[in-house]
Amino acid sequence: MMLSAVLRRTAPAPRLFLGLIKSPSLQSRGGAYNRSVITGDRGEPQRLRTAAWVRPGASSVLFPGRGAATGGRRGERTEIPYLTAASSGRGPSPEETLPGQDSWNGVPNKAGLGMWALAMALVVQCYNKNPSNKDAALMEAARANNVQEVRRLLSEGADVNARHKLGWTALMVAAISHNESVVQVLLAAGADPNLGDDFSSVYKTANEQGVHSLEVLVTREDDFNNRLNHRASFKGCTALHYAVLADDYSIVKELLGGGANPLQRNEMGHTPLDYAREGEVMKLLKTSETKYMEKQRKREAEERRRFPLEQRLEQHIIGQESAIATVGAAIRRKENGWYDEEHPLVFLFLGSSGIGKTELAKQTAKYMHKDAKKGFIRLDMSEFQERHEVAKFIGSPPGYIGHEEGGQLTKKLKQCPNAVVLFDEVDKAHPDVLTIMLQLFDEGRLTDGKGKTIDCKDAIFIMTSNVASDEIAQHALQLRQEALEMSRNRIAENLGDVQISDKITISKNFKENMIRPILKAHFRRDEFLGRINEIVYFLPFCHSELIQLVNKELNFWAKRAKQRHNITLLWDREVADVLVDGYNVQYGARSIKHEVERRVVNQLAAAYEQDLLPGGCTLRITVEDSDKQLLKSPELPSPQAEKRPPTLRLEIIDKDSKTHKLDIQAPLHPEKVCYTI
């Protein structure tokens, strides 16, 4: 169990410091050495030596076989000054801890001890606990189990989910403090039991906030709890985690009834069950996990029925209906249990650059995992072109540099065995990497450089490649042109109900006779291609999809202009038709993005630099062409349109709806500059 790693036995040293400062022994006899002091609210008599030093036996962290702060063996008489140990982990001499003290058994110098006590008083003063607002008062009331005060503060508008300056909430305070009545009131007021603590460890939090670690430690123990290990990380712990640490059955039951997720993990990857002791709390958590998983499964199934995966993907990806349908069907089989559990899903995405292959993989990972950072693993296979670079994939063998670090793939698969793994541009990888993939795709497991086996049968592997992209693009354009001509012929025959469709389908004959031989010649092994579940084809964009891409880019820059410069950007409908001409099949959507930057954003930047755009103005992008009808048929431009290419201009719309075009001075082009020697 991990409970011993986060709890301590007795009162920690900071309360001893506070007791020392407040003790009357410092006010009589010049701080005599043999006077007892009262420490905090626990009433533990300690001497001055105990106040300045921490012994492993008196305030030990419950790590099996280790001392409190030294990490030594149990029973060692190692003594470490707490002040220095809390700040840097180094054990100074007694003279460093108590200025003016000549030896451990000697009488301390009054002046030196007074300076040390004054410094500690300043530390405590920095973290005075007087609540300055309702949220801070709510934290205090929750810790003190003052139910009446909690209700009063909530009725006056205190935020029930407000966080302490170090990251925890009032519900977490009540849970760790065994205050069941306060937990009930907070849950009834709408407290979220699934919020995670932002507090990590004392030293990390102190470093992040730029304060002394002792200040953070005093605040953590006074405002939250004094029995938690200050070296452990609590980031992401929920109120249920803390209730389990407190081993409070009634509060655990209240939180579960209030909607707490028993499967939620903290930053260390631990669920509340991992911290439970043997007993009623553990039984309750196991039962709750089973029920919660069943409810979650039904809820996700209902959500998938109402909002299918294909619709979610289409919100982020323009076009590629066939690719989305293929991936969606495979994911649906996996989610509903209609798949081979002994083998992972493997996809190969084929198509030209900038056409949505990587984006589809990202959106699939976002759909499958809440945590997209851990749930999506991307490896650029161009980094594995040499034979010796295979070691980076699974880790170096024993005796070589990097053996302890592990491989890029195996290390991440250990953290998330069911991740979506993207092998980008797999055609550039060395053949030895493909040999490793054979085992990965066939058996769903991988052995790293240390000899450990990672089971990843539940993962989804996606490979992208530009192999045969020219053949796919030419074939798709030919099919689209044939479909367009067929639709026009049927319209010419007075079939008024005919609609022009941009949807085309790659034939099986083309896949088997054209694409597969190219793949076989490149990868040089049939067994590798035979382990791929689906080969997904990405086709060039049609005209309507290009219009969507242009509008998407213009909307992006309109939003940027409004946020950064308070400028409203509008455009005519013909602008999209003009920008579509910049599309290049080889570069996909990137060519549209670059065309918008060249023809629109360049003008905006030049006008802004020349101080032609007043703040809060409204701009409109127009097409400067006397014959706009030339833009109506972008597939078959006339010779006249080629001689007179349309240009884009910016104009300002005044408050009275009058417009005037901006006179933007063309910047100097580098290729037109003549250098003289």
Swiss-Prot record:
Any single biological process term in GO: RIG-I signaling pathway
Disulfides per UniProt: none
Keywords recorded for this protein, A-Z: Acetylation, ANK repeat, ATP-binding, Hydrolase, Mitochondrion, Nucleotide-binding, Repeat, Transit peptide
First and last residues of the transit peptide: 1-57
Region span, Disordered: 64-103
Residue numbers of N6-acetyllysine PTMs: 559
Catalytic function, reaction form: ATP + H2O = ADP + phosphate + H(+)
Subcellular location: Mitochondrion intermembrane space
Residue span of region Autoinhibitory: 92-126
Cytoplasm is among the record's keywords: no
Subunit structure: Homododecamer when substrate-bound; the homododecamer consists of 2 homohexamers stacked head-to-head via ANK repeat-mediated interactions. The active substrate-bound form is likely to exist in a dynamic equilibrium between homohexamers and homododecamers. Homotetradecamer in the unbound state which is remodeled upon substrate binding into the homododecamer. Interacts with PHB and PHB2. Interacts with MAVS; the interaction is enhanced by Sendai virus infection.
Note on domains (UniProt): The ankyrin-repeat region is necessary for ATP-dependent protein disaggregase activity. It plays an important role in stabilizing the substrate-bound homododecamer by mediating contacts between the two homohexamers.
Protein name in the entry: Mitochondrial disaggregase
Source organism of this protein record: Rattus norvegicus
Protein encoded by which gene: Clpb
